[in-house]
């Protein structure tokens, strides 16, 4: 995408801020349905960043696959499993503190692993360098063309050099879907238990007394 330098910087900062705020909302909001909608906004913002990087195919794949398929699947799972508004009921969690600590450490480890991979990955192919003199302008243009690549080159790199991060992201999306179903299912079971207790506490119409739960 060809834009003025100032517009590019502003758009990049805006999209990065949208990704950060949306990601925090996905994690912190108590309503899982709102979190799913914010997840769609995060994925759309990432697609916008791809457009700024002239990765049109990757941006289109991001919208079609992640927003149009995976995020919609998560929304369907939430709305079909959970009959209420998706709010996590307080005090219904049976997870122990040890389990929560393990989950937190696992998330921190995955985040550190991805950050280390981003920092240490050689994003430029070997032998391709940025030209810094007028005599190297032709080589720089050829390198730029080579870096744009084609669909076949993208597929080759995804399933060779970047296979591990690709599978890690797929695993994270699977965990997100399973977690959404578990949270929604847990609240539904809690509501059923409350309904059963309410039925047991209904007064007996014959004598007007409340039956005992013993």
From Swiss-Prot:
Q: Member of which family?
A: Belongs to the complex I subunit 6 family.
Q: What does this protein do?
A: NDH shuttles electrons from NAD(P)H:plastoquinone, via FMN and iron-sulfur (Fe-S) centers, to quinones in the photosynthetic chain and possibly in a chloroplast respiratory chain. The immediate electron acceptor for the enzyme in this species is believed to be plastoquinone. Couples the redox reaction to proton translocation, and thus conserves the redox energy in a proton gradient.
Gene3D superfamilies registered for this protein in UniProt: NADH-ubiquinone/plastoquinone oxidoreductase chain 6, subunit NuoJ
**What's its membrane topology?**
Multi-pass membrane protein
The entry's protein name is NAD(P)H-quinone oxidoreductase subunit 6, chloroplastic
Q: Mark the transmembrane ranges.
A: 10-30, 32-52, 61-81, 102-122, 163-183
Gene behind the chain? ndhG
Record's subunit section: NDH is composed of at least 16 different subunits, 5 of which are encoded in the nucleus.
């Amino acid at each position: 995408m060809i834009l003025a330098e100032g517009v590019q910087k502003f758009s990049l900062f805006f999209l990065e801020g949208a990704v950060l705020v949306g990601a925090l909302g996905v994690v912190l909001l108590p309503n899982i349905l709102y979190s799913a909608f914010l997840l769609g906004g995060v994925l759309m913002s990432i697609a916008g960043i791809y457009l700024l990087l002239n990765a049109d195919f990757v941006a289109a794949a991001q919208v079609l696959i992640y927003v149009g398929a995976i995020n919609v699947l998560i929304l369907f799972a939430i709305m079909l499993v959970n009959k209420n508004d998706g709010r996590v009921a307080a005090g219904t969690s049976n997870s122990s503190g040890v389990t929560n600590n393990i989950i937190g450490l696992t998330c921190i480890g995955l985040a550190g692993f991805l950050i280390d991979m981003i920092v240490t990955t050689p994003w430029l192919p070997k032998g391709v360098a940025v030209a810094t003199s007028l005599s190297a302008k032709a080589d720089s243009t050829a390198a730029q063309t080579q870096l744009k690549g084609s669909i076949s080159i993208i597929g080759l790199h995804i399933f060779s050099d970047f296979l591990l991060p690709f599978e890690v992201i797929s695993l994270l999306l699977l965990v997100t879907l399973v977690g959404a179903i578990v949270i929604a299912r847990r609240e539904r079971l809690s509501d059923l238990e409350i309904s059963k207790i309410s039925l047991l506490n209904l007064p007996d119409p014959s004598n007007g007394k409340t039956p005992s739960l013993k």
